[in-house]
Amino acid sequence: MDKLLVKIENDSDFMNIVGDILENKMVQQMKNYRQHFNTSCFDHCLEVSYCSFIICKKLHLDYVSMARAALLHDLFLYDWRGSKKKLHLKRLHAFIHPYIALQNAQKICNINEKEQDIILKHMWPVTFFQFPKYRESFIITITDKLSSLNSFRKYILKKEEKSFLKYQKKLDS
């Protein structure tokens, strides 16, 4: 994330589009919640947003709506592990959090129709009947999954490194 963070901070187009959202208190709270493995919800959303922004820009799609919606797509602000019981949710997190994220996003900025679709449909194909209406909505379904896989990859590499160092320490003894 460090290399990507430098890229993001140096991309004035991206920062001009999402800067106001990044400074929002509610968005900053995403740093307090773990999304996948050791990745915060904030870092995950930032990675998805920037990667989606780049793809949409190259494909001459609506990269502004994409960057903003992708940054807000997981703005649910709770620990989702075991959340259905703990929070008395009517449905599983995978199915309900896009609606919670949209409600929270609407509290902090105006959300256009495309941004709404991007946020609500980002879990497709898990939410099978919520088919993406726009190309941007489909793109986030891919970048979101790739970001999750990237978090998993980093987690496994870190575990392997710890295991290797522990083994190496035993050999040196």
Language-model features and meaning:
Residues M1-S173:
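Metal-dependent phosphohydrolase cores
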